[in-house]
């Protein structure tokens, strides 16, 4: 374990957090709010810890995957705790656990909230709450990699630990260049959505907050009804962008480099759009009697399907009142999630495709025991290591899911609330059903249950293993 480089990286996360908080201070100044002190205090704390840790570069830059996982997990814990300080000091969320819940939900792009009334919050707090989605969407360590040569030739171990999906690949030979490309695409798409929303007459502050949530696939709304009170134009634009942010970003790089055929032949993306289209049509047919016509049912269905499968969590209607078939489809989409290499959460479409192909292979072996069958995705043979890691991931995922449902059941809420609460947090979605539906929140849970759900949100965003490593004694051995 290279403790020095880990503390150096975590120190830079403290420094970055201080820089990030400058924007909500500017927001407070613009709107004449008194919450500047809360953010200034948080900045002083962050710099007071971060600057000493980054004053001297580490001499030993050997950095293995275990070090990367620990650095990433600790960095996200640091983001969560320091990010909660303004909520507590401003009085917006007085209790530390509630504040950490809200902050973790923001950075992990979950969008689950303990707040029943968000419209009364100061603009600076609302801005910070939404901005955490954008920061966490692509990953703060990936952002750090795009700025600083942190770990010599060992960048990939850091990127692999934070990036979602069963495997992580470089777009170009240099990892730092890959990180810059990813953030360039991320920023470019963010600016595009801002422009489109402004053209539709959406106020600038609302535009920024909605876009931060869309880009990070987060879902914190600044209205009590999420996006329900905005125009159809705003909802349609947001639908398109949240679906686009759920696509593997490598496809956009291929398009930018004019490799159109390769981009449109990515198997995961074809499944992704196929699942979305099928779900939209089924739900639109099932809910058509609840709207003024099929066109409106289709539009509302498209928004909710896009929001759930990408794990954004915005809503334009109370789908808690939808028929059982529609709600069942949405719950299934919670688990499927977005594409690997996107800002979305969930199990990921690539893993679902892999499981389906593995199941088909096993079925074929029953019929033809001597046949030699290989699993291929995008014309490439999937390695046994990838299959093994996928199976282990799903096994641990199931254990955490069941354990979390059992623990929060101590609060004596109904099964659907408990089940979808864990599904919504472990898959980084936000709203569930019943008490935690799109018009509800997580405030009713005990602090024990909120702590469990905080763990689930972090585990879901970090794909479980980096966070779990913190709890193993062998992780902390020097050699």
Show where each model-derived region lies.
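Membrane-proximal intracellular helices of multi-pass ion channels
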Residues: 1-479
């Amino acid at each position: 374990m290279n403790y020095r480089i880990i503390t150096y990286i975590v120190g830079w996360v403290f420094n970055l957090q201080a820089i990030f908080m400058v924007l909500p201070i500017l927001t407070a100044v613009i709107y004449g709010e008194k919450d500047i002190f809360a953010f200034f205090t948080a900045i002083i704390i962050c710099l007071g810890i971060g600057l000493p840790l980054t004053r001297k570069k580490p001499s030993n830059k050997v950095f293995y995957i275990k070090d990367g996982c620990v650095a990433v997990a600790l960095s996200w814990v640091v983001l969560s705790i320091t990010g909660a300080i303004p909520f507590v000091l401003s009085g917006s969320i007085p209790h530390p656990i509630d504040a950490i819940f809200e902050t973790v939900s923001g950075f992990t792009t979950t969008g689950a909230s303990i707040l029943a009334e968000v419209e009364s919050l100061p603009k600076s707090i609302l801005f910070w709450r939404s901005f955490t989605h954008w920061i966490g969407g692509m990953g703060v360590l990936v952002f750090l990699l795009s700025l600083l040569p942190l770990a010599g030739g060992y960048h990939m171990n850091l990127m692999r630990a934070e990036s979602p999906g069963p495997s992580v690949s470089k777009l170009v030979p240099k990892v730092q260049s890959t990180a810059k490309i990813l953030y360039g695409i991320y920023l470019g798409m963010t600016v595009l959505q801002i422009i489109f929303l402004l053209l539709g007459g959406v106020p600038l502050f609302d535009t920024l907050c909605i876009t931060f949530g869309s880009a990070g696939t987060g879902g914190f709304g600044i209205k009590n009804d999420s996006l329900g009170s905005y125009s159809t134009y705003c909802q349609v634009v947001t639908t398109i962008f949240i679906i686009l942010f759920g696509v593997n970003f490598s496809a956009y790089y291929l398009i930018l480099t004019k490799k159109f055929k390769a981009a449109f032949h990515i198997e995961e993306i074809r499944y992704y759009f196929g699942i979305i289209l099928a779900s939209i049509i089924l739900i639109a047919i099932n809910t058509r009697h609840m709207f003024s016509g099929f066109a409106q049912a289709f539009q509302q269905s498209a928004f909710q399907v896009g929001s759930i499968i990408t794990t954004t969590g915005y809503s334009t209607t109370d789908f808690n009142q939808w028929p059982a078939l529609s709600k069942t489809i949405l719950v299934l989409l919670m688990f499927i999630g977005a594409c690997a290499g996107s800002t979305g959460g969930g199990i990921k479409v690539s893993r679902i495709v892999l499981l389906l192909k593995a199941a088909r292979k096993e079925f074929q072996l029953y019929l033809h025991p001597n046949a030699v069958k290989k699993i291929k995705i995008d014309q490439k043979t999937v390695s046994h290591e990838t299959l093994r890691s996928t199976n282990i991931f799903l096994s641990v995922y199931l254990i955490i899911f069941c354990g979390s449902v059992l623990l929060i059941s101590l609060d004596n809420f109904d099964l659907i609330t408990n089940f979808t609460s864990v599904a919504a947090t472990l898959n980084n979605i936000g709203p569930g059903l019943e008490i935690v539906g799109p018009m509800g929140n997580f405030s009713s849970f005990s602090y024990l249950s909120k702590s469990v759900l905080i763990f689930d949100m972090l585990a879901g965003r970090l794909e479980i293993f980096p966070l779990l490593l913190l709890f193993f004694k062998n992780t902390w051995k020097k050699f």
